[in-house]
Amino acid sequence: MKKYYATILYFLFCDVLYYYLAYNHRLWSITPTPPLTSEFVALIGEFIVFAGTILLFLGRYPPNQFFSIRWTGLWVILYTANEWVLLKTGTFVYEHGWTLVHSFIFNIFMFIFLRLHDQRPILTMILSLPIPFILIKLFSIPIR
């Protein structure tokens, strides 16, 4: 876990930044069933699901480029399929024009950036800087 600590922090920071910037104008949100709260589900997601994803995704990342593309594609499909199930069960909600297609594209970037951060963290942070501004502009997110 120590090897991927910085990448886990990068991921958590990006997710928390989304929740902060889009607090009153969320593009997607979780609507858990009682007795679970949104905060509890978010914490479980942050510290168990997302951290576990990074450990599995990067920990078993194949050295071969052909297999690495397939590995990344598998994770994009897993995350998108999971989101589709959550969407169909009403646990996940889209707002303000966000769709499953947007999530699919977002997942592609997310997994590419996770791998890139593992290899070149400074470059990844520089490349990540415009993403919130692009999303703010595309989806008319009011700045807090």
Name each model feature, range by range:
Residues 1-144:
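Aromatic-rich, lipid-facing transmembrane alpha helices and their immediate juxtamembrane interface loops
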